[in-house]
Amino acid sequence: DNDAGTTAFKAGEVDVSQQFIANVQDLWLKDGLPVSTYLPEPPYHIGASLPTAFFNLGAYGLDQLAVRKAIAIAVDYDTIIANAMTNQSATFDQVPRSLMNPTPGEQALYDHDAVKDLQFAGKDIEGAKKLLDDAGIIDTDGDGWREFEGQNLHYVATAPNGWSDWQAAIEVVAAAGKEIGIDITTNYPEWAVYQTVVTNWPLQEGYDIFMMWSDGAGPTQPWSRIRHLMSSEFAETTNNWNGNWGGYKNPAADELIQAIPSMTDEAELKNAYTELVKIYLTDIPSFTLMYRPQSFHTVNESVWTNFPHEGDGTVPPVPPLNLMDGWSIAGLYNVTLVNP
C-alpha cells in the first residue's frame, strides 16, 4: 500500500523507498525532511518502463479499432502525469509514444519521422468523436452513450486497489470515455484477486480495460518488452505472467519479433523496430499511460547518507535501483552513517 509505505518512509523507518510517493518534492521542500531522489528536478527518476492500459479484445466492441483508438487518443495524459504521477514522468510531448522507454539508447532504435503521423499526445476529444462518428458508432437513442450494433458501449476500467498512481490514471481513462460518449466505470479489486484474473484467459467480466506493467531496462530490451506487449504466443493463454494479456494477434508483428534476435545489421534492426512501432500505433491493442522508472529511488538520510544520485562521481555510475539489483549493489559500499 503506497500510503502506508510513505508514512513509514517519512518517519525514517525506511532508508530507501522503491514505492511511488505522490509529490515527492514536498518531503524536502515543505516538510524539511532529509529526503532526496536520484535526479534533483522533475521527473526525479530515470524513466524505464511503460505502465500500460490493455484492452480486453474479447470484450464487446473492443475488437473495433475505432473504439480502441478513440479511447486512447481522448485520454488526458498530461493530467495523468501531473496528478497520477505528480510529474515523476516525462510527457508524451517530450517523449512521443512508441514501444521504447525514454532512454537515449532505446529512442535511437526507431525512425521517429516515419511514425510521427501515428503518435498521439492525448486529449483529442474532437478527433475521437469524429473517428466514432465516421465508423457509425453513434448515440441513436439519446441516452448519452454510443452504441455498436445496437448495444451501448459500456466498459469497466480497473487496476489493483492501493496502487494509487495506477488508480488515478484509470480514473482519467474513465473520464475520457464520458467525454466521447463511451460509458467507462472503474473498479479496484485487491491484488490477490486482480493478478489471478488478468493472467488467465478468458478474462472475467469487469476487466475490459486494465492496467499492467511492461518490461523496464535490460540487455534484451526493447525486444523483450515488445514481445511481451505484442507476441501472439501469449495471447489467450492461462497462467500468463509474460504479457499480451488482452489477446492481441498479428502475424506480421510475430514475424518481426521472431526475426530481430538474429539481426546484426543496425539499419535492418532499426527498420524492424520502426515497423513494429507502426503496427502497434496503428492497431492500438493497448496504450501506454505514463513513463515510469525501473524503480522509484527515494532516500531518507536520517540514518545513512551518500546514496547514489546523478553526478555522484561513481565510475561506472551506480544506477538508481535501490542498492539491490545488479551494479546498484555497489552503492552499499559508499553509504555512511550520518552520526557514526
Which stretches of residues belong to each language-model region?
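Ligand/substrate-recognition segments at binding pockets and active sites
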Residues: 2-5, 11, 18, 119-121, ...
